């Protein structure tokens, strides 16, 4: 973040995300939990802003929390782009507490503007959430915008030929015989 507190976040581009211009993109942040909350905002609420999807993945034994949380990553950038957002920052869809974000892919809707999308780790998302709360009504920095600068170097490359190697190492199928 550039303001109100200077803080560098570790980001990873979401698979399939477009990049930003070389100088990056700076804009105020709007925090939402998930896609339904984004869609419930008044018209123009995210125009030219960075949407921060802050929904936490629920830790479950069967992994069902992942399915509930992943929509913000897969569909969120297209929906935010349609609403006029400049970029998306996503709380990592995972429960790890290290500073390396979990990513995956997104699916741009062919009729929606494509905007850059990055993931940040849970600890970095916690810091950004605190900054958003500090600047909200009643916070100690109420009224100050949270400004983020995002720089994404992703780009589409032309298709090319590649190959996978599939092999069998003799003796591994029946190793004990």
PLM feature spans:
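Mature extracellular/periplasmic domains of secretome proteins
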Residues: 41-46, 75-86, 103-109, 172
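Noncatalytic luminal/extracellular "stalk/propeptide" segments of secretory-pathway proteins
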Residues: 1-50, 54-62
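Protein/peptide-recognition domains central to ubiquitin and immune signaling
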Residues: 1-8, 85, 90-107, 123, ...
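Active-site-proximal beta-strand/loop segments in catalytic clefts of secreted hydrolases
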Residues: 32-35, 53-57, 90-94, 120-123, ...
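Long, well-ordered, tryptophan-enriched scaffold segments
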Residues: 82, 86, 108-164
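Second-shell loop/turn segments in exported
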Residues: 16-20, 27-32, 41, 61-77, ...
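Catalytic-core environment of secreted peptidases
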Residues: 43-45, 49-71, 77, 92, ...
